[in-house]
Amino acid sequence: MASLYVGDLPQDVNESGLFDKFSSAGPVLSIRVCRDVITRRSLGYAYVNFQQPADAERALDTMNFDLVRNKPIRIMWSQRDPSLRRSGVGNVFIKNLDRAIDNKAIYDTFSAFGNILSCKVATDEKGNSKGYGFVHFETEEAANTSIDKVNGMLLNGKKVYVGKFIPRKEREKELGEKAKLFTNVYVKNFTEDFDDEKLKEFFEPYGKITSYKVMSKEDGKSKGFGFVAFETTEAAEAAVQALNGKDMGEGKSLYVARAQKKAERQQELKRKFEELKQKRHESVFGVNLYVKNLDDTIDDDRLRIAFSPYGNITSAKVMTDEEGRSKGFGFVCFNAASEATCAVTELNGRVVGSKPLYVALAQRKEERKAHLASQYMRHMTGMRMQQLGQIYQPNAASGFFVPTLPSNQRFFGSQVATQMRNTPRWVPQVRPPAAIQGVQAGAAAAGGFQGTAGAVPTQFRSAAAGARGAQPQVQGTHAAAAAANNMRNTGARAITGQQTAAPNMQIPGAQIAGGAQQRTSNYKYTSNMRNPPVPQLHQTQPIPQQLQGKNSEKLIASLLANAKPQEQKQILGERLYPMIEHMHANLAGKITGMLLEIENSELLHMIEDQEALKAKVEEAVAVLQVHRVTEPAN
């Protein structure tokens, strides 16, 4: 198997679109578009797994930078080991690029020096180039060759710089060491009459000056700041220590410090801002409350009045838009954590105005996102464990057998197909002959399930049920013979080692005509194990006959809204099977099981749109055909 990373994807591209594109290069095992845990929006990249490395290499060579939704995609080999990606070996940094140079232009320029693993031009939120980029070569030799050849060259009329990539931590460490050896000084907060000569006279006592400049406006007036460059580091440090904070009159205090580049200054300001924000958050932690679902008539004063009985309030604010209308939420800050806790206990859910309030401790955006992500992952883990621990017995209303492990994969390559059961997930609803309407006999299915959802026949149960209760005789031998004949006709087979009932034998679990109904068996027939006990699940309500009509989508949607997740799949399966059976009767069971891996919303769309269903069915048939061709002979 070979895996490719596909980046720079538009937000609306999904697995289906990528499958259509990459399947032309060769058999695709799986495709996964990476999405946000909470919003499920695409993160802009995906992984495509090919069966053969040659097919993946063909896709990389022929499809890299192809347009998808009028946007070029970026393809490279997937590096699963993060140490290889972050080592910096073979990585080259390019800056001073022309704004017209994109990823493809960089790739075409540098591919002459060696095999490129990845290349990227940095862009802003609008997709405009930031003027720098990166190229990752397979070998360090190719990277060094590109530096020697391209550094100082003209690309689109601009002289570019090409050098070895230095990780951010090393750059910051290097800048920190350089910061101690500065000679250039930044000066601000002096009066408007300060010119270049006055600036020189002011700083000259602290050492030899190589250059000095007061920045001025177009009319010649000072902007209030300037620069002084000393010959030695000692002189610059002495000037900073002596003059920083000096009173300049007119209420101004002189600011003198090491001159910084814009990016360095912005980074330092950002770091200080984060520190202040963290301190402010820590100071109000446990005392600041978030209040939402506020009535439109509630303002700051009414919010304070509502919360004032529970403690001393330091601030209360209802958030408003530009026109002063309430946004429906606000914040209340108490003096003590115990007061805030009391307010949450008493006011959460209480009606204030005309709406019940939601009151909780305020959280930062990052904390709230992390908390929601944690909740979502716990919920998904619980659902997986619940499905893993349950074995479902097909009941009279459905033939759906839930897969042991859930899967979000929509496309099934040959490797996935080899893991499929020989028997489909869908068990046929076997209608017993009239002579044995009460007999319950278990059998493993070999075909699909009954297409008609209304008037569902009684399903055969395991013959082992009689081992735990009374074993009444069936009057006559015709019922047993008919049951055995019916099982042969439906393709059912008994479990290995299970004795078949002879015509004159007693049938365990059978019902005497006109007698009371036997209790349902707690055993289940499978093709590879002996009658494992299964937990009793409640019977789902059979789907009404009217759902088989044309105008049934609204009724199905209403049933799904009131059903549990397992029952939703059963309802959709009962509706899909007869539609698929008309297209491919022999494969209807397997195809239905494959399609039920898809999300319910898309299944509903396929029920309404015959063309969409037909396309998806043909796709599943193609996968099964590939599986049959590639499956080794037994």
UniProtKB/Swiss-Prot annotation:
The family this protein is said to belong to: Belongs to the polyadenylate-binding protein type-1 family.
Membrane-traversing stretches: none
Keywords: Repeat, RNA-binding
Keyword RNA-binding: yes
Name of the protein this chain belongs to: Polyadenylate-binding protein
NCBIfam families linked to this entry: PABP-1234
Gene3D superfamilies per UniProt: 3.30.70.330, c-terminal domain of poly(a) binding protein (1.10.1900.10)
A cellular component term, taken from the record's GO annotations: cytoplasmic stress granule
Native species: Drosophila melanogaster
